[in-house]
Amino acid sequence: MHPFRFGVVVNTAASGADWIARARRAEAIGYATFLVTDHLGRQLSPLTALMAAATATTTLRVGSYVFANDYRHPLVLAREAATIDFLSGGRLELGLGAGWMTVDYRRLGMPYDPPAKRIDRLAEALPLISRLLSGETVDHEGPAYRLGGAEVHPRPVQRPRPPIMVGGGGPRMLRLAARYADIVAIQPQFSPKGRARLREATDGAMARKVAILREAAGESFERLELNVIVADAGLAGSGRPVGTSLLAAGKSVATHLVGTPFALYGTVGQLSDALERRRDRFGISYYALPSRALDEMAPLVEALAGR
């Protein structure tokens, strides 16, 4: 059983100083990771932002949540990841996914291939990135990628390599994660326009996803750290309306998520009990909280982190 960890997903800031202050605040509260997503809208560029957060802190881990595989060649991404891990003293978590938001592909002028093709490319890229970060010299000729004598320098500090997170919600993505990941971000599936499919964000759906992971990983299941993204979170008595961000994602059915792993509302005691039960049932121990809840959820982080 993994101890509880909490990350905070932060994509924007009012200024450079504000970005640094947020990273330092997260570290002071006890968040384990400072996470940045990978979209082409109004957010900071993840690689540069993660390095800035790492430079401003001493123990806070930084991570991509998650890099879209199609946007970068595996060697280019492995080099960037190795450099961040080296310069941060070994604090990178490398999150990867197949890419899913149509507007990002349109902005890049890239074809938005069917999921099977995007997952094919990720399945080819994952072992290449893992081998490169582990210090191997890689020669490869495949359907999507070719590498000849490829290496990354300097080597990452973490050995054999920085932990890899794979994010996804469909059966094939979960099986891929079971094979290559150290951390699995179990996500509700999204429509190409970015709306969560809420039928995939229930406790019943979570049980099915974990069962797929368990079957695919076999004896290695216990080594996997299971993560979920929290769409909205709040402590009882905070005065903030419940489900405002969920309503943006799912309209009138948003309240159905209250009480699932994807929405955390209640007192510290209630939430502590709920997270303990979910860890016992599903194995979920790592929660990625939204930036707006960074300070509000501090009492929960302080109560559970490391337990």
Say what each PLM segment does.
Residues 1-307:
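Active-site-adjacent structural elements that line small-molecule/cofactor binding pockets in enzymes
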